[in-house]
């Protein structure tokens, strides 16, 4: 093995880095279809390859240390490879003006190319993704719900009683594969970034595996080619900028942050097209504090689910107690003694 020169790496290490980078890029491409509408589709892959910007200053690193470093890189890559987000924090878009404007945009694109109708996101699904995560079972979902509830006071302290207004203007794409409405520049962006970082930290402290927050780019997806593999087979490989040229600087409206939902990517969507929601937090008040219909439905559903779960748990506990040896007979004996005493009292 050749000794690397000061400040550089040898050819073998260079080939390993290139091979690792290529494998990471292939993995990123394979998972892009499922995550492409999330804000982390453009995460820098250097960390996955163990590449840093720091020069190598220790030229006499032992072979043992090389093995340790290699093992750490493999574990980090394996952890990243096994990580597959299935839940996310969503800021739902409820402003009818924004929804109407996006539907006009979608129809304008479809009129120019009818094939793209299959690439459009339904209006009930419009949202901003704040954080993606992996929750593998019901216990982890409950931990996620607890983390979401803990997030509420941090956000309210950050906003200090003020509304966070999110104005949407203009169109952008991710690699001409995903079309989204841009969040206009302003102080609100920094506030939203801080909320995202706080959410990332809160969920990580609970032991939940979450996505990278440093590449968070808030956006509102309205179309993505990955929704229909048929498009690529029929020659539609990119979103032509000419299709949305008239909307390039269009003002779509403002959304006031009032709710954050913990949603599932995989469970069946609600009847209105919105994602399955495990729990929500309300930030401030909307319309005088009156919850909307969708929120009432979610709260009612959650209450019913909790009631059913408690009833099932109680039934299981009672069944287990009855089946324990000795307890059943003692219960019967106590009941018999009680009946005997009652009969004796009646005779008296």
UniProtKB/Swiss-Prot annotation:
Region named RI-alpha-binding: 295-319
Among InterPro entries, the record links this protein to:
AKAP7-like_phosphoesterase (IPR019510), AKAP7_isoform_gamma (IPR052641), AKAP7_RI-RII-bd_dom (IPR019511), Cyclic_Pdiesterase (IPR009097)
* Compartments reported by the entry: Nucleus; Cytoplasm
Q: How does it assemble?
A: Binds cAMP-dependent protein kinase (PKA). Interacts with PRKCA; only the cytoplasmic form is capable of interacting with PRKCA.
For this UniProt record, give its keywords in alphabetical order, as a comma-separated list. Answer: Cytoplasm, Nucleotide-binding, Nucleus
Q: What are this entry's molecular-function GO terms?
A: nucleotide binding; protein kinase A binding; protein kinase A regulatory subunit binding; protein kinase binding
GO CC term, one of those recorded: cytosol
**Binding of AMP, residues:** 129, 219-221
Pfam families xref list:
AKAP7_NLS, AKAP7_RIRII_bdg
UniProt protein name: A-kinase anchor protein 7 isoform gamma
Q: Which species is this UniProt entry from?
A: Homo sapiens
């Amino acid at each position: 093995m050749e000794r690397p020169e000061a400040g550089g790496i040898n050819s073998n290490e260079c080939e390993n880095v290139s091979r690792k980078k290529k494998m990471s890029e292939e993995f990123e491409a394979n998972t892009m279809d499922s995550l492409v509408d999330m804000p982390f589709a453009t995460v820098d892959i250097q960390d996955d390859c163990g590449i840093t910007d720091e020069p190598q200053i220790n030229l006499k690193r032992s072979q043992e240390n090389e093995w340790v470093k290699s093992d750490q890189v493999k574990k980090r890559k394996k952890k990243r490879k096994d990580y597959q987000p299935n839940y996310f924090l969503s800021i739902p878009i409820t402003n009818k003006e924004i929804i109407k404007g996006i539907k006009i945009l979608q129809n304008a694109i479809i009129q120019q190319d009818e094939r793209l109708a299959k690439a459009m996101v339904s209006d009930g699904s419009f949202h901003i993704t704040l954080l993606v995560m992996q929750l593998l079972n019901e216990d982890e979902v409950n931990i996620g719900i607890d983390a979401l509830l803990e997030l509420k006071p941090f956000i309210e302290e950050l906003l200090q009683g003020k509304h966070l207004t999110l104005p949407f203007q203009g169109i952008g794409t991710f690699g001409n594969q995903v079309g989204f409405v841009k969040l206009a520049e302003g102080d609100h962006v920094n506030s939203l970034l801080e909320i995202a970082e706080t959410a990332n930290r809160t969920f990580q402290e609970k032991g939940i595996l979450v996505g990278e927050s440093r590449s968070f780019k808030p956006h509102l997806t309205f179309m993505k080619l990955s929704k229909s593999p048929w498009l690529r087979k029929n020659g539609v490989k990119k979103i032509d900028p000419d299709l949305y040229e008239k909307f390039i600087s269009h003002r779509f409206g403002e959304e006031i942050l009032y709710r954050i939902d913990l949603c599932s990517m995989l469970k069946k969507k609600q009847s209105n097209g919105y994602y399955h929601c495990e729990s929500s937090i309300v930030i401030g008040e909307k319309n005088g504090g009156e919850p909307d219909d969708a929120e009432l439905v979610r709260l009612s559903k959650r209450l019913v689910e909790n009631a059913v779960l408690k009833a099932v748990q109680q039934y299981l506990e009672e069944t287990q107690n009855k089946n324990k040896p000795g307890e059943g007979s003692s219960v019967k004996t106590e009941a018999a003694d009680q009946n005997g005493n009652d009969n004796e009292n009646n005779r008296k």
